[in-house]
């Protein structure tokens, strides 16, 4: 195998691995940065950082949902982000609980299941629940 690129100390994940869509990685990078760790978009072919948005926290997680990135922030907000290398674009946000959230949310049947260190939560995210 051939190493294509390497960035020491710049793309360090704390708890979770990034998700991949259309040749780009979307993940929380910033081992040791606690609540300030950014969500970044990285071009897989070159390692180039396309954009970075601070404030998600190193302990959060990312999952692909409907072609977008759902981020479980380290302090409770669930944030839906457009999976695009052009720019960071927040599509929706829900503060479901506080405390430390270090687990990956699960999406199934139009529902989002998440938890923190003290409680679990289920959010109905189906289009019928939004009044559409």
What positions do the PLM features span?
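Noncatalytic, solvent-exposed loop/strand surfaces
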Residues: 1-132
């Amino acid at each position: 195998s051939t190493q294509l690129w390497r960035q020491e100390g710049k793309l360090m994940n704390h708890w979770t691995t990034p998700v991949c869509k259309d040749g780009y990685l979307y993940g929380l990078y910033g081992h040791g940065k606690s609540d300030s760790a950014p969500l970044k978009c990285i071009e897989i072919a070159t390692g180039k950082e396309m954009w970075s948005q601070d404030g998600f926290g190193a302990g959060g997680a990312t999952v692909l949902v409907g072609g977008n990135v759902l981020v479980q922030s380290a302090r409770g907000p669930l944030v839906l982000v457009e999976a695009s290398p052009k720019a960071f674009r927040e599509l929706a946000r829900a503060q479901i609980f506080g405390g430390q959230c270090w687990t990956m949310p699960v999406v199934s049947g139009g529902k989002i299941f998440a938890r923190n260190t003290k409680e679990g939560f289920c959010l109905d995210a189906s289009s019928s629940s939004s009044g559409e």
